[in-house]
C-alpha cells in the first residue's frame, strides 16, 4: 500500500453540499473500494480577499489515504465523485500527492503558508505542481480551486494547521456538560490525543468536561482535542483558541 494526500477546494455554492462533506465522501469511497484507510478530513483556512472568489470561508479540505490503488485510479474515482457532487457554479480543483515519492516538501509548505496571507495565481500553482510532480487538475468554472487544493497539501504537511471537519458529539449539549476521561474520549472519537492550548498532553486517566461545540485540530501531526484549564477543571477549548487553526 502507498500513502497519499488528497486535497480539494472550491466545490460548493451557497445552499449546496459543502466541500468538506464531498471530501469525506471521496475519502470513504476510496478507502472502501480498495480495503485502504482514510484519515479524518482537515479544513485549512486560506486568504480571504476581494480578489479571491469563495463561498463562505475560503478553505481547502485535505485527507490522507493509505491504499493499493494507483494514482490514476485514485484520480479517476475522486474526480468522478467531485464532478458529480460539485455545485454548477463552483470552480473545483483537486491535488494528489504521492507522499512516498521524492518531492520538495519545503517548497510545498511555503506555498501553503503564502496562500494564507496573499493572492496566488493559478499559473503559480500549476508551475509548482509540475516542478514537484503533483497531480493538479481543475474540473469546472474558472478552475480557481486548484490554488487552494495545492495549498491545502502544503498546510497539511506542516502538521500543525487545520481543524478536523465536523463536530465531536459525545452527548454534550450547549447548556449541559459531559465529563469523560481522556481514555474514553480517544476511544469514542478515534482522535490521537487530548492536549492543552500550551501543548501539555493529558494523561489517559485525566478528566475533561465537554460542553457546546467540540472540535478537534491537527497539531504535531496528530488529531487532537484542544482543552484549557478553568477553575482546576479541563474543558474543551473555545472558538478563540480554535481560530489559530
What are these regions (language model features)?
Residues 2-245:
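Conserved mixed alpha/beta catalytic, RNA-binding, or beta-rich assembly cores of soluble enzyme
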